[in-house]
């Protein structure tokens, strides 16, 4: 054939082939087989723009024909027209000239360290690195090479995937690398298209190496649009200012000799190794380029050479510069510049030396000031200088006055302590609590007590009986004292010092109860009696006789003297020899008539009839028949007494005044002392001080007190708050302020604050009492060491105390209300020594007693000096505690802090106050200490004796121990040594505890069988990601205020502090926890101690941590501002494309020009152009609730590519979802499809804002032209989070609904989820909410004044964790937070079938809007509509609320349904006959009966469900008499009184907390909640902050945990509940957790901006279990237990292996089955190879529709046509037979039947089936009935050897059958989990 013809035929063939390919289906696989196998083609040529088919042919040859070709010795060539033209046309390459010999490159071994160094540099690009050395000479150039397509493709793909080059294999295709992410794939293909101009067909399926080969032939070797743009962005965003691409290229050329092509390659390599942040200097940039060049060299297989060290000297014409000439030139230039500067200065009239002159003057002034400061410090000292700094701030004042709330809280705490057996008897502490409650009694509190006491279930045990008895008595007490003033009455035990020395030589001190003095009443008597040391010194009888003798003898005669001498001698002998006269007594004492003792005996003390009597006597006011003053012994000074000034000017004991004081003390001890309407200032009342005890007494007596503290902190304010919460009486107020009594400014500011009007920021008080007890110790300072501290102490205790009194005097406005000042005097007038100026300070105060007379302030201040005796345990005296017992043995008295406070408070009685107004009063409270001579020596001896005894015993103990060890061995003490047992962690992950069925039935016995469980929605799983980790760890902190060991371990794991290791560690096998940083083992017992502080610091509400928010620092919040530039700017360099864009924007205000060396462009912005310049402002929202630092999705097992792809909020949602599933016992989500169709699993979770990080990227980062992923838009959608959950975990095809309800989103989600389940659209739904925290939202919330200002809070002395304070007086806005919360909800019926844990029942949910308005965030009360209920003039409640009534109606309806079902089954024979006539020969009776029976059963179930729904679930709906809330509770036989807790939205805003409290209160009131039964208010946001979308989900989780534990967590930040909330009697605001005896139901309310109100009510699952029969419940309990064990194992493995989250890589069905599964609602998975998958058999299965019971029944019915005429069909519901009724069973079943049924797998079904068989048999007999109540015991159903039922008739039944002609009865029984059916046939 001629060549021309061949060419024409070839052309025709090619055309036809192309036409065929375009017009017909592609059959390329078959085509390849034809030419490769049939024709053995060796040369295959593709004609086209790229080697698409050629590539496929190459892969086919490699995979299919490799061995085939080898066998036939075929050498195939696959060529492409566009790529292999030379091979196709056989065009040889021209011969190349031999290359010149090149220097040897460095060896690979030598370059390896350089590469390693470069890699190290790349990991820390931002670190400060020394700039590379400057080239000493020219570098040898490397032959240039254009960029290869392989490198370009590799870089573009790796950069898009955010991976290093070595993590992207070239052997994989793009489709494989993107892992199914179509968006990323499209981005890569788009970038390749831009870069190369065109792409081959299906490039995503081609391996990168092949794709590179296809591109290489047409690739020019220059960078395209995409790579140029990326490099330009790298240079502008990560290089230091001024370091442009031109600089980079020049550096690479000079440093390494790289040409333009290789420079491009290095810059491409840099794209995959971008620094984390902008490099700081040019040196850093060059170091970075060095690293990138080395990476490129390693990749390209070349060696980089450095500049030649001798290059500078090797040049022939190198110039040499004379250094002297250079220096002269530089000096001349500087001189010229200086002359020009001076000339310009003269012209501008500027003095160049002005600054220097001013500096000299400032320096001189500074020197003078420094000298003065040095002098001042030298005189006063450093301690004094620091000590006088003022600290007072009225902003930091804390006011406590919410006694009304704490009274109810304390009462409940005591109540539950009694019920739980913690308080079993009435001790002093209990009586004290009762007194405090009585002090706060009001009508509301009495109603509160009455409700709990009257409804106390005493049948529960003795503790409940005790609680009722004591409660009734306390109620009576409170009623008696209503309207009376509160009193301070201390009923504590009196204690004394006791010091012992143990056998081991330890000195042990304790406060021991005094048995002889048990009450303060007896204590006062003891004080009045004094002691041996306080007796007045009197002469003896002998001395009196001697004086008489001398006086008489002077006047007597001589004889008389002799006679008198004789009588005197005889008297002396009588006195000395008498046993009746004590010679040491005075004459007066010897002749005195003894008086009766007032000391109560032990018998008197124990004579009370019962504990109740002691409480009952509390309100009584006892009249004192014989005052204690009458018992003061003559010539004895009481331990406590009042002194008056004698004529000599000395202070001496005054019996009259002392009597007044002691009688007042006695009255205070017996009847109490009130301080109502008293305004008091107390300083020096720190913990453990006398002042603190005084303060406690003042507020318990109703005083209004301002107390100061010099150590202001959260710990200190909590101390005072706790004191007030416990002791604050009605009408009392406690105000705490920071105050330094050493500062004059603070003294003035404090008094100004007290007296200023409230409008001026003050209190507007007028002080009645001043108790200035502030002091600091000066131990160890003698007169030779009076230092700075001593002087400062003197200033506090004297100077500024006087200033304080003077300031009060100056502000006193009336002379009729003087302030009583209790001066803290001391008996220590240098007695102890070495106490600095302490004694001098105290003595100097005594001058005020004289100045009261001599100065003009006597009508405004009164003086009462209190000489304070030895008080044990105070800061000043605690070191002397051990010798106090020895001191008391001398006959004096030391005091406890309570005793001394009682003594001082006794000075505030009206009688003493009146005395003070007449004259200054000196009260000696020294206990007789002043009568001890040489006190210092005696105390020293006591101390030395104790120390010596201790030393001796210690030495003896040591010696004995040594001897024992020598004799008995070293381990002799092992059995006696104290061992501290530290338990190991036990992480349980428990499911809710299930009670026994009998306990369940006691809860609600009438609920069994009442509800349609498919219309009951339950929570089976819940979880969260929040500031406190997860739901478990958050609950520990919320309920207990601290982490358990297990909680600490979990938090440490979450925060990346520890990880689990199983393998070799440092060469040894180790399994356990290790520190994540040091890789060292950590014992689980030590984790809490080691990491807890760091955990607490970096979790919860805290200062914003910039590393969590991409560097966002609110202290430097960045914003931009537009400015017009005033002069031309310096030019800068960028790419051509970017330069043109600048020109396009700025027009003639911008000049651009090309830079010839690099091809880059120079840009110059001209005057008049507008620029946006960044600025930073100090933003005051510095605090937020943040995810724990170190939280990482990788810890849970989420893949890296997913983390890089999605918004951070999506990660929170994924983790919360998988934890929620595990909480539900679901370890594989595909298990759902074993029970439900894929269309029945939905997701209704939502968010307020969605992916805010993605939104930020879309708007802010994109606007700033920062790198942003191209598919960022999809991550911003609110429904994307749900989409990821489905794509990675569920693979469901059910409803997806995405609520957006601002802060109410989560509860709205629950509402939608419930509706979705109840409507039948789904059976399992994921609900919840989620939101992130970002600076944009934070700023806008601040602009709305919705959030609290951290700066303002800091000024008020608040710590970050205190800044969210719902319900408090000082609440000031909500605190933002971030996180997610998810619940798994499903129908109760499904939950029971699956055996998943049921955490709570969702009894009700609702949403509501509010009224007309103009404010979107304004709070409203629309949600009150859940309590909508018409009352009108209706007198009687609806019978529908009575469960017994509803049960009766349901029973009737079920009987009707059973009758209908039986009749339908009976009619089936006739129906089959008619159908046979209709369908003819094709008719199958068996199939017809099966299908129709199934339909009847299904219809019966539907009718039963509707009946239960009508009378159980939905009876209240649309009934105006029954509120939705009331009806939802009544469904479970609960009332409005059974809502135990209301979880408040509680945002800590003024408006919300009041509005929400009013709403809940109105709701309870309208629905008739009992008075005195407030709900516990839970305000979770004090702990977590406000996460917006997740808020309701976290609250719901907390509500579930409340139901499970019975613990009601308190609002620990509620330091003082707002007075305005007192009006809401139906809400209690606890500040601490209270363990109750069970919570039945919890209400959760949520409110969102945009008129969103929502409420959900959860009920304890016990009320659901009460609906079940015993068999169903016990079967469920078994399956839950098994699931719990499985989940327990999974959770432990998940934590130790970081595999909690396991992403699904495929759906549970193959692609081929997708549509089949979708279209078959009965398709279910089966478990194959440990996986749940759909199979062909499971889709459209013949067995999936007709149930076993229908088959069995149909089979029995089909035999009716062939059998006898007596037929009986009976249907019984399993739920209707009460097998717990023993009487019923014994009456209707034989013992054998009972035994058989009880031993069956399902006793409920077995009994029901047997009963149905009995009924069917009776019907088959056709005999007359004996009535509905007749026993069926005579019809016995027995089982044969095969288990088949047989009928045995006995007695009357047998006789009736015989009379009817019945010979035998055959019966068939079938049942499922819903009903049992029996068909009986009689044989005649």
UniProtKB/Swiss-Prot annotation:
InterPro entries assigned: 4-PPantetheinyl_Trfase_dom, 4-PPantetheinyl_Trfase_dom_sf, ACPS, Acyl_Trfase/lysoPLipase, Fas_alpha_ACP, FAS_alpha_su_C, FAS_alpha_yeast, FASI_helical
Entry's EC annotation: 2.3.1.86, 1.1.1.100, 2.3.1.41
Sites of O-(pantetheine 4'-phosphoryl)serine modification: 182
Induction: Expression significantly elevated by the presence of glucose. Down-regulated by unsaturated fatty acids oleic acid and Tween 80. Up-regulated during in vitro biofilm formation and hypoxic conditions.
Start and end residues of each Carrier domain: 147-222
Residues that hold Mg(2+) according to the record: 1770-1772, 1870-1871
A biological process from GO: single-species biofilm formation on inanimate substrate
Residues annotated as catalytic: 1303, 1545, 1586
Comp. bias intervals (Acidic residues): 601-613
Binding positions for acetyl-CoA per the UniProt entry: 1770-1772, 1796, 1806, 1815-1825, 1839-1842, 1869-1871
Keyword Lipid metabolism listed: yes
The Ketosynthase family 3 (KS3) domain, residue ranges: 1120-1660
Composition bias, Polar residues: 584-600
GO annotations of cellular component type: fatty acid synthase complex
Catalyses which reaction(s): acetyl-CoA + n malonyl-CoA + 2n NADPH + 4n H(+) = a long-chain-acyl-CoA + n CoA + n CO2 + 2n NADP(+); a fatty acyl-[ACP] + malonyl-[ACP] + H(+) = a 3-oxoacyl-[ACP] + holo-[ACP] + CO2; a (3R)-hydroxyacyl-[ACP] + NADP(+) = a 3-oxoacyl-[ACP] + NADPH + H(+)
SUPFAM superfamilies xref list: 4'-phosphopantetheinyl transferase, FabD/lysophospholipase-like, NAD(P)-binding Rossmann-fold domains, Thiolase-like
Chain spans, region Disordered: 91-141, 583-613
Low complexity biased stretches: 111-129
Keywords associated with the record: Fatty acid biosynthesis, Fatty acid metabolism, Lipid biosynthesis, Lipid metabolism, Magnesium, Metal-binding, Multifunctional enzyme, NAD, NADP, Oxidoreductase, Phosphopantetheine, Phosphoprotein, Transferase
Disruption phenotype: Essential for growth in fatty acid-free medium, but dispensable in medium with fatty acids. The growth in the presence of fatty acid depends on the type. Able to grow in a concentration-dependent manner in the presence of myristic acid, palmitic acid, or Tween 80 as the fatty acid sources, but unable to grow in the presence of unsaturated fatty like acids stearic acid or oleic acid. Intracellular survival in the murine macrophage line J774.16 is significantly reduced compared to wild type or heterozygous fungal cells. Required for systemic infection in mice.
Miscellaneous section: It can potentially be a fungicidal target. Inhibition of FAS2 by cerulenin impeds the growth of wild-type and heterozygous strains.
Family, as annotated: Belongs to the thiolase-like superfamily. Fungal fatty acid synthetase subunit alpha family.
Subunit record text: Fatty acid synthase is composed of alpha and beta subunits.
Protein role: Fatty acid synthetase catalyzes the formation of long-chain fatty acids from acetyl-CoA, malonyl-CoA and NADPH. The alpha subunit contains domains for: acyl carrier protein, 3-oxoacyl-[acyl-carrier-protein] reductase, and 3-oxoacyl-[acyl-carrier-protein] synthase.
Name of this chain's protein: Fatty acid synthase subunit alpha
């Amino acid at each position: 054939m001629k060549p021309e013809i061949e060419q024409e035929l070839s052309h025709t063939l090619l055309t036809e082939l192309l036409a065929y390919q375009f017009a017909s289906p592609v059959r390329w696989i078959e085509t390849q087989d034809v030419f490769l196998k049939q024709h053995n083609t060796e040369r295959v040529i593709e004609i086209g723009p790229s080697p698409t088919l050629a590539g496929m042919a190459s892969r086919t040859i490699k995979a299919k024909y490799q061995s085939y070709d080898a066998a036939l010795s075929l050498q195939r060539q696959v060529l492409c027209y566009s790529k292999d033209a030379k091979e196709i046309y056989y065009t040889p390459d021209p011969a190349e000239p031999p290359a010149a010999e090149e220097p040897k490159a460095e060896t690979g071994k030598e370059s390896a360290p350089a590469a390693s160094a470069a890699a190290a540099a790349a990991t820390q690009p931002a670190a400060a690195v020394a700039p590379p050395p400057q080239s000493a000479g020219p570098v040898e150039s490397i032959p240039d090479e254009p960029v290869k397509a392989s490198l370009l493709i590799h870089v573009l793909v790796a950069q898009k995937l955010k991976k290093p080059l070595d993590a992207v294999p070239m052997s994989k295709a793009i489709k494989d690398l993107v892992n199914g992410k179509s968006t990323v794939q499209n981005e890569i293909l788009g970038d390749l298209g831009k870069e190369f101009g065109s792409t081959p067909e299906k490039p995503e399926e081609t391996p990168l190496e092949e794709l590179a080969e296809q591109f290489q032939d047409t690739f020019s070797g220059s960078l395209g649009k995409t790579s140029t743009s990326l490099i330009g962005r790298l240079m502008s965003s990560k290089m230091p200012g001024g370091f442009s691409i031109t600089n980079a290229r020049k550096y690479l050329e000079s440093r390494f000799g790289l040409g333009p092509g290789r420079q491009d390659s290095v810059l491409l390599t840099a794209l995959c190794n971008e620094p984390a942040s902008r490099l700081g200097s040019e040196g850093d940039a060059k170091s970075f380029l060095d690293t990138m060049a080395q990476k490129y060299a390693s990749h390209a297989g070349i060696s980089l050479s450095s500049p030649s060290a001798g290059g500078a000297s090797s040049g022939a014409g190198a110039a040499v510069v004379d250094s002297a000439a250079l220096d002269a030139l530089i000096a001349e230039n500087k001189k010229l510049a200086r002359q020009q500067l001076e000339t310009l200065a003269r012209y501008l009239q500027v003095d160049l030396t002005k600054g220097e002159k001013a500096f000299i003057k400032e320096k001189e002034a500074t020197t003078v000031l420094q000298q003065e400061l040095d002098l001042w410090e030298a005189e006063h000292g450093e301690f004094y200088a620091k000590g006088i700094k003022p600290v007072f701030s009225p902003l930091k004042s804390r006011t406590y006055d919410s006694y009304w709330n704490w009274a109810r809280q304390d009462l409940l705490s005591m109540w539950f302590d009694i019920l739980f057996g913690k308080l079993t008897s009435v001790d002093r502490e209990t009586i004290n609590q009762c007194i405090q409650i009585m002090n706060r009694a009001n009508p509301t509190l009495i109603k509160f007590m009455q409700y709990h006491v009257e409804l106390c279930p005493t049948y529960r045990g003795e503790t409940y009986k005790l609680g009722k008895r004591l409660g009734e008595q306390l109620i009576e007490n409170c009623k008696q004292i209503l309207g009376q003033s509160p009193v301070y009455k201390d009923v504590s035990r009196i204690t004394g010092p006791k010091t012992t020395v143990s056998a081991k030589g330890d000195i042990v001190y304790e406060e021991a109860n005094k048995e002889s003095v048990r009450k303060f009443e007896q204590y006062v008597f003891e004080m009045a009696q004094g002691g041996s040391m306080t007796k007045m010194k009197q002469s003896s009888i002998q001395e009196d006789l001697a004086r008489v003798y001398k006086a008489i003898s002077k006047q007597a005669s001589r004889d008389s003297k002799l006679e008198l001498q004789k009588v005197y001698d005889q008297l002396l002998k009588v006195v000395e020899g008498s046993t009746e006269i004590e010679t040491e007594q005075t004459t007066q004492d010897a002749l005195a008539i003894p008086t009766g003792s007032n000391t109560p005996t032990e018998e008197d003390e124990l004579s009370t009839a019962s504990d109740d009597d002691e409480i009952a006597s509390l309100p009584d006011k006892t009249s004192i028949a014989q005052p204690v003053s009458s018992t003061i012994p003559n010539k004895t000074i009481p331990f406590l007494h009042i002194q008056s000034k004698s004529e000599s000017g000395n202070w001496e004991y005054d019996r009259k005044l002392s009597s007044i004081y002691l009688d007042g003390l006695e009255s205070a001890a017996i009847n109490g002392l009130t301080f109502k309407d008293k305004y008091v200032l107390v300083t020096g009342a720190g913990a453990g001080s006398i002042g603190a005890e005084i303060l406690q007494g003042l507020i318990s007596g109703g005083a209004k007190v301002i107390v100061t503290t010099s150590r202001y902190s959260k710990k200190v304010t909590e101390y005072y708050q706790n004191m007030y919460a416990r002791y604050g009486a009605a009408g009392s107020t406690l105000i705490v302020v920071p105050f330094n009594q050493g500062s004059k400014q603070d003294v003035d500011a404090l008094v100004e604050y007290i007296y200023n009007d409230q409008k001026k920021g003050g209190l507007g008080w007028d002080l009645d009492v001043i108790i200035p007890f502030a002091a600091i110790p000066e131990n160890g300072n003698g007169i030779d060491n009076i230092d700075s501290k001593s002087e400062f102490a003197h200033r506090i205790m004297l100077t500024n105390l006087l200033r304080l009194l003077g300031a009060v005097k100056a502000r006193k406005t009336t002379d009729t209300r003087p302030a009583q000042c209790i001066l803290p005097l001391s008996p220590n007038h240098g007695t102890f020594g070495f106490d600095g100026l302490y004694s001098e300070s105290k003595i100097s105060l005594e001058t005020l007693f004289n100045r009261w007379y001599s100065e003009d302030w006597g009508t405004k201040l009164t003086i009462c000096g209190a000489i304070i005796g030895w008080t044990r345990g105070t800061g000043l005296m605690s070191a002397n505690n051990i010798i106090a017992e020895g001191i008391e043995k001398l006959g004096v008295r030391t005091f406890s802090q309570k005793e001394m406070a009682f003594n001082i408070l006794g000075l505030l009685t009206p009688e003493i106050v009146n005395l003070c107004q007449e004259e200054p009063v000196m009260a000696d409270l020294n206990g007789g200490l002043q009568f001890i001579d040489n006190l210092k020596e005696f105390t020293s001896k006591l101390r030395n004796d104790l120390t010596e005894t201790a030393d001796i015993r210690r030495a003896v103990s040591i010696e004995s121990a040594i001897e024992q060890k020598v004799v008995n061995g070293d381990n002799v003490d092992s059995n006696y040594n104290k061992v501290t047992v530290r338990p190991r962690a036990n992480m349980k992950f428990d499911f809710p505890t299930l009670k026994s069925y009998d306990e369940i039935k006691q809860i609600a016995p009438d609920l069994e069988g009442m509800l349609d469980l498919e219309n009951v929605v339950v929570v089976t799983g819940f979880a969260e990601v929040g500031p406190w980790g997860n739901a478990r760890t958050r609950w520990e902190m919320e309920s207990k205020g601290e982490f358990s060991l297990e909680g600490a371990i979990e938090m440490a794991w979450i925060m990346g502090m520890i990880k689990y290791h199983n393998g070799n560690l440092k060469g040894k096998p180790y399994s356990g926890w290790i520190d994540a940083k040091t890789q060292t083992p950590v014992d689980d017992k030590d984790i809490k101690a080691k990491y807890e502080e760091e955990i607490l610091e970096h979790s919860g509400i805290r200062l914003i941590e910039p590393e969590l928010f991409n560097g966002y620092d609110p202290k430097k919040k960045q914003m931009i501002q537009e400015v017009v530039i005033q002069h031309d700017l310096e030019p800068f360099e960028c790419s051509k494309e970017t330069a043109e864009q600048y020109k396009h924007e700025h027009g003639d205000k911008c000049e651009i020009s090309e830079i010839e060396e690099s091809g880059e462009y120079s840009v110059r912005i001209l005057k008049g152009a507008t620029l946006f310049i960044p600025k930073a402002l100090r933003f005051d929202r510095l605090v937020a609730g943040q995810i724990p630092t170190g939280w990482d999705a990788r810890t849970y097992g989420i893949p890296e590519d997913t983390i890089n792809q999605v918004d951070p909020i999506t990660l929170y949602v994924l983790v919360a979802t998988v934890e929620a599933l595990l909480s539900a016992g679901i370890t594989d989500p595909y298990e759902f499809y074993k029970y439900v169709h894929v269309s029945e699993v939905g997701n209704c979770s939502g968010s307020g804002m969605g992916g805010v990080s993605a939104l930020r990227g879309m708007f802010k980062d994109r606007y700033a032209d920062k790198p942003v992923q191209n598919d960022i838009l999809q991550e911003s959608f609110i429904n994307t989070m749900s989409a990821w959950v489905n794509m990675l975990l569920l693979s469901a095809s059910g409803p997806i609904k995405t609520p957006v309800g601002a802060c109410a989103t989560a509860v709205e989600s629950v509402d939608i989820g419930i509706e979705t389940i109840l409507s039948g659209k789904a059976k399992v739904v994921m609900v919840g909410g989620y939101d992130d925290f970002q600076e944009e939202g934070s700023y806008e919330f601040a602009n709305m004044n919705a959030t609290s200002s951290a700066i303002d809070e800091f000024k008020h002395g608040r710590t970050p964790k205190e800044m969210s304070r719902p319900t408090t007086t000082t609440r000031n806005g909500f605190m933002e937070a971030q996180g997610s919360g998810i619940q798994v909800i499903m129908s109760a019926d499904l939950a029971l079938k699956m055996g998943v844990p049921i955490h709570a029942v969702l009894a009700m949910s609702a949403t509501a809007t509010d009224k007309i308005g103009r404010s979107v965030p304004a709070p409203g009360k629309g949600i009150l509509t859940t309590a909508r209920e018409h009352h009108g003039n209706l007198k009687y409640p609806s019978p529908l609320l009575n469960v017994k009534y509803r049960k009766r109606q349901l029973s009737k309806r079920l009987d009707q349904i059973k009758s209908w079902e039986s009749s339908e089954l009976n009619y089936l024979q006739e129906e089959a006959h008619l159908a046979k006539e209709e369908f003819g020969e094709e008719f199958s009776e068996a199939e017809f009966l099966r299908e129709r029976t199934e339909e009847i059963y299904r219809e019966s179930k539907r009718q039963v469900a509707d009946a239960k729904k009508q009378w159980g679930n939905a009876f209240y709906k649309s009934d105006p008499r029954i509120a939705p809330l009331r009806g939802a509770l009544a469904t479970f036989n609960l009332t409005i009184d059974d809502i135990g807790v209301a979880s408040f939205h509680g945002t800590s805003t003024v408006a919300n907390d009041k509005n929400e409290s009013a709403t809940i209160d109105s709701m309870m009131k309208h629905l008739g909640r009992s008075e005195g039964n407030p709900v516990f208010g839970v305000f979770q946001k004090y702990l977590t902050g406000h996460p917006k979308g997740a808020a309701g989900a976290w609250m719901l989780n907390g509500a579930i945990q409340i139901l499970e534990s019975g613990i009601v967590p308190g609002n620990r930040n509620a330091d003082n509940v707002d007075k305005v909330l007192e009006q809401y009697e139906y809400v209690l605001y606890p500040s601490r957790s209270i363990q109750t005896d069970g919570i039945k139901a919890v209400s959760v309310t949520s409110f969102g901006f945009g008129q969103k109100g929502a409420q959900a009510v959860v009920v304890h699952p016990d009320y659901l279990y009460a609906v079940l029969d015993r068999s169903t419940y016990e079967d469920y309990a078994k399956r839950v237990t098994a699931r719990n064990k499985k989940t327990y194992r999974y959770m432990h493995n998940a934590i130790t292996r970081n595999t909690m989250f396991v992403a699904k890589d495929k759906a549970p069905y193959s692609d081929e089955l997708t549509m089949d599964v979708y279209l078959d609602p009965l398709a279910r998975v089966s478990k194959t190879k440990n996986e749940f998958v759909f199979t062909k058999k499971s889709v459209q299965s013949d067995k999936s529709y007709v149930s076993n019971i229908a088959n069995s029944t149909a089979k029995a019915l089909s035999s009716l046509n062939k059998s006898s005429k007596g037929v009986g069909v009976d249907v019984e519901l399993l739920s209707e037979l009460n097998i717990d009724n023993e009487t019923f069973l014994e009456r209707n079943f034989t013992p054998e039947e009972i035994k058989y049924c009880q031993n069956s797998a399902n006793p409920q079904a077995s009994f029901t089936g047997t009963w149905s068989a009995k009924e069917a048999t009776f019907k088959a007999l056709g005999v007359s009935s004996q009535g509905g109540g007749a026993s069926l015991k005579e019809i016995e159903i027995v089982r044969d050897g095969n288990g088949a039922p047989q009928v045995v008739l006995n007695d009357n039944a047998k006789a009736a059958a015989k009379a009817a002609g019945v010979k035998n009865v055959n019966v068939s029984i079938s049942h499922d989990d819903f009903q049992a059916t029996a068909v009986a046939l009689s044989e005649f």
